[in-house]
């Protein structure tokens, strides 16, 4: 009886970009099997998977940027039963030796999977936590814009004529904005007309953003109640703090193997310092989940 030869495993590495992904296939001994590139569309993802499986058995893939450009491809790969591993950044030593190119980065991603250097499971982006991330992102931009609006309004009042400043300046932002939003005319000169229009526009922008923030906060409260009700019972943890922690963990928190892994992800784990002293990872202030 004739037996079909058993398919060997191939490993896929992908360097992701906004419009195009570059992929490299290697076998289990590290030889390059093939290289290709596909557009970042649903059809392109299917073509990539079909292309890879046309050579041998595809079970593992290393993808750069699984939280950004590679997110859609990672989800499609997982739906096809491929184990996706996150490639945090290209190996710098290999990049220095071989130069920077998309095929090289894709090859390095595949080799990181083969060598066991890449073992991070990508964050899932398809549930309540991803919804929280979207709301939180919109909320942060609204807070920033609202702060800019009141700062610009106050800056104009500081340099305005004394009589106008005395009438419109109020300590509480709500009172100051309310007065400026009702402005009709401060005078007939070009300066006073421009000042009237600008103050009124900034005040109404602030009020619009305040209303938008109220809606976003309500949505965030509802989402955190559904996804992390127990977390909200902890002292000092409100909807925004809970959302930040949940977004850090992702929709699949089981990917974090220990409490130490979460601390490292938050930038709050100890780092070995000078003379054997340990210090918290305060060198990473951009990590929202690790802020005091």
Predicted regions and their residues:
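A detector of single, family-specific signature residues
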Residues: 1-292
């Amino acid at each position: 009886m004739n037996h079909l030869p058993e398919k060997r495993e191939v490993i896929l590495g992908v360097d992701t970009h906004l419009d195009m992904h570059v992929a490299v296939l290697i076998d289990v001994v590290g030889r390059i099997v093939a290289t290709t590139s596909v557009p970042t569309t649903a059809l392109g993802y299917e073509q990539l998977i079909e292309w890879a499986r046309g050579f041998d058995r595809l079970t593992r893939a290393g993808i750069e940027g699984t939280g950004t450009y590679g997110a859609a491809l990672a989800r499609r790969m997982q739906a096809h039963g491929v184990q996706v591993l996150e490639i945090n950044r290209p190996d710098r030593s290999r990049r220095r030796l071989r130069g920077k190119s998309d095929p090289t980065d894709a090859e390095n991603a595949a080799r990181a999977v083969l060598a066991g250097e890449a073992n991070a499971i990508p964050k899932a982006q398809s549930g309540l936590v991803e919804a929280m991330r979207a709301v939180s992102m919109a909320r942060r931009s609204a807070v920033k814009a609202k702060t800019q609006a009141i700062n610009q309004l106050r800056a104009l009042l500081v340099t305005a004529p004394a009589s106008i400043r005395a009438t419109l300046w109020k300590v509480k932002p709500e009172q100051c904005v309310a007065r400026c939003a009702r402005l009709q005319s401060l005078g007939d000169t070009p300066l006073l007309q421009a000042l009237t229009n600008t103050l009124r526009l900034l005040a109404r922008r602030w009020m619009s953003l305040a209303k938008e923030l109220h809606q976003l906060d309500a949505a965030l409260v509802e989402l955190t109640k559904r996804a992390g009700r127990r977390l909200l019972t902890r002292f000092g943890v409100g909807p925004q703090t809970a959302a930040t922690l949940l977004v850090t963990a992702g929709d699949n928190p089981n990917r974090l193997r220990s409490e130490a892994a979460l601390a490292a992800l938050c930038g709050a784990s100890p780092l070995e310092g000078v003379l054997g002293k340990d210090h918290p990872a305060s060198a990473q202030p951009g990590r929202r989940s690790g802020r005091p």
